[in-house]
C-alpha cells in the first residue's frame, strides 16, 4: 500500500524549515569541537522539492512504550503532556531548553525484554518484504534474528517495558482511534543544510589563521523502516532499522567492500571555482541503523594551500559523522520524536477554525 504526500505544503511552510534549522543548530552547539574548528552554526535548511517514497508495510496498534510517560511534578501541574529522560535511566535533565524538534528517549536500551511473536504468521504476512536487512539487534538487547524481516516490529506486544524511572509514572489511556503505521521510507531527495564554520590553522602558532568556510550538505539518502503512531492528538515518529536496496545486500562482503572503498576515497570531484564536492557514505559496520545512508558536501573556499584543504576534509568528515549521530540518537528507536497537536487553551473557542500547529516535546538523550 502506498500513498501520496502533499510535499509542497510542507516546503511552503517556512516555520518547519526554521524549526529544523534551529534544532540542528542547538544540537551542533552542544558538540565538543575539534582543535581545527572555532565556531559552527547552522545558517540554512531546506526540505527541497523531492518527497520521499513511502510504503505502508503494516497497520496496527501503537507500541506500548508510546503510552508510557514519566511526569515531572512541575509539568504535571501545568497540565502539559510530559516527556522526561528518566525513562532512559539518565539523571541529567535538559528539559529547560526547548528546541523546536526533539526526541524522547523511551527507555534504557538494556531494559527491553523480547517476547516471542507469532513468527510463522508474521513471516507469511510480510513475505513481500524479503529485501529487509537481516540485521543484528544485539545493540538494543533484542538478540539476533535469523528472519528476513524485523518481525518483532510488526508485533505491538513484542517488547515489555521495565521502567527504572524516578518520579511519577503515567500511562496515557488507550483509545480505539489510536493507530500505528510501519512505513518503509526511501528518500533520495534534494534537502539542503547550510553550515558555516571557522577553520583554524594552528601552525606555526595557535589560531594562526582563521578561515570562515561555508558547507552545503545535500543529496541525503535514507532507506529505513519507521514507526509512525497517532494517539492522544500526538504523532510519534521513530526509525526502527535500515533496509537493503532491492538490488543489493548491505551485509554481503562484496557490498561492504564497495562501501569501504567508497568511504576511503570519498568519491572526490575536482574543485571548481574554489569549491570542493565530496560524497560521503557510512563506514563499514553492522549496526542496526544509521538512518543517513549517504550525503554530499559542497564546500565554498578560496584558493588555499594543501594543508588548509586537508583541514577542510577533516571538517567535512567531522560534520557528516556528527550529523549522522544526531539524527540516529534523536530519532532512532528506542528514541522518538513526538509532535504534540494538543492546543494549550482548550477553552479558546476563537481559534477553533484555525489550523493546529505542532509543538514538540523535549528530553535529553544519553548516548
From Swiss-Prot:
Recorded GO MF terms: lipid binding
Membrane spanning stretches: none
Species this chain originates from: Clavispora lusitaniae (strain ATCC 42720) (Yeast)
Topology within the bilayer: Peripheral membrane protein
Subunit structure: Component of the ER-mitochondria encounter structure (ERMES) or MDM complex, composed of MMM1, MDM10, MDM12 and MDM34. A MMM1 homodimer associates with one molecule of MDM12 on each side in a pairwise head-to-tail manner, and the SMP-LTD domains of MMM1 and MDM12 generate a continuous hydrophobic tunnel for phospholipid trafficking.
Keyword field contains Repeat: no
Superkingdom, taxonomy of origin: Eukaryota
Protein name: Mitochondrial distribution and morphology protein 12
Biased composition (Polar residues): 103-112, 273-282
InterPro entries the UniProt entry points to: Mdm12, MMM1_dom, SMP_LBD
Pfam family, one: MMM1
Compositionally biased spans, kind Acidic residues: 343-354
GO cellular component: endoplasmic reticulum membrane; ERMES complex
Role: Component of the ERMES/MDM complex, which serves as a molecular tether to connect the endoplasmic reticulum (ER) and mitochondria. Components of this complex are involved in the control of mitochondrial shape and protein biogenesis, and function in nonvesicular lipid trafficking between the ER and mitochondria. MDM12 is required for the interaction of the ER-resident membrane protein MMM1 and the outer mitochondrial membrane-resident beta-barrel protein MDM10.
Compositional bias annotation for Low complexity: 356-367
Amino acid at each position: 500500500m502506498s500513498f501520496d504526500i502533499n510535499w509542497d505544503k510542507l516546503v511552503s511552510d517556512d516555520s518547519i524549515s526554521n524549526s529544523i534549522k534551529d534544532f540542528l543548530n542547538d544540537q551542533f552547539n552542544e558538540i565538543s569541537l575539534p582543535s581545527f574548528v572555532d565556531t559552527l552554526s547552522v545558517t540554512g535548511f531546506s526540505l527541497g522539492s523531492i518527497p520521499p517514497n513511502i510504503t505502508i508495510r503494516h497497520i496496527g496498534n501503537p507500541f506500548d512504550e508510546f503510552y508510557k510517560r514519566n511526569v515531572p511534578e512541575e509539568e504535571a501541574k501545568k497540565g502539559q503532556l510530559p516527556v522526561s529522560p528518566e525513562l532512559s535511566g539518565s539523571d541529567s535533565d535538559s528539559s529547560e531548553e526547548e528546541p523546536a524538534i526533539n526526541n524522547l528517549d523511551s527507555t534504557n536500551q538494556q531494559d527491553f525484554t523480547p517476547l516471542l511473536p507469532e513468527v510463522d504468521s508474521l513471516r507469511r504476512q510480510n513475505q513481500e518484504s524479503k529485501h529487509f536487512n537481516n540485521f543484528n539487534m544485539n545493540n538494543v538487547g533484542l538478540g539476533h534474528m535469523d528472519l528476513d524481516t524485523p518481525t518483532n516490529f510488526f508485533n505491538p506486544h513484542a517488547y515489555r517495558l521495565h521502567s527504572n524511572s524516578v518520579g511519577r509514572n503515567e500511562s496515557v489511556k488507550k483509545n480505539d482511534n489510536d493507530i500505528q503505521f510501519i512505513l518503509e521510507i526511501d528518500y533520495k531527495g534534494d534537502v539542503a543544510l547550510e553550515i558555516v564554520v571557522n577553520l583554524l590553522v594552528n601552525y606555526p602558532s595557535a589560531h594562526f589563521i582563521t578561515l570562515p568556510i561555508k558547507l552545503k550538505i545535500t543529496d541525503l539518502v535514507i532507506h529505513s523502516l519507521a514507526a509512525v503512531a497517532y494517539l492522544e492528538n500526538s504523532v510519534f515518529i521513530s526509525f526502527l532499522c535500515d533496509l537493503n536496496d532491492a538490488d543489493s545486500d548491505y551485509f554481503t562482503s562484496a557490498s561492504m567492500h564497495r562501501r569501504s572503498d567508497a568511504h576511503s576515497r570519498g568519491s572526490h570531484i575536482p574543485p571548481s571555482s574554489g569549491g570542493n564536492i565530496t560524497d560521503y557514505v557510512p563506514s563499514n559496520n553492522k549496526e542496526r541503523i544509521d538512518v543517513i545512508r549517504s550525503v554530499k558536501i559542497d564546500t565554498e573556499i578560496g584558493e588555499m594551500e594543501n594543508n588548509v584543504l586537508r583541514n577542510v576534509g577533516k571538517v567535512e568528515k567531522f560534520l557528516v559523522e556528527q550529523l549522522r549521530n544526531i539524527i540516529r540518537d534523536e530519532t532512532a528507536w528506542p528514541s522518538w520524536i513526538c509532535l504534540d497537536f494538543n492546543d494549550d487553551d482548550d477553552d479558546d473557542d476563537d481559534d477553533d477554525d484555525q489550523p493546529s500547529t505542532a509543538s514538540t516535546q523535549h528530553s535529553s538523550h544519553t548516548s
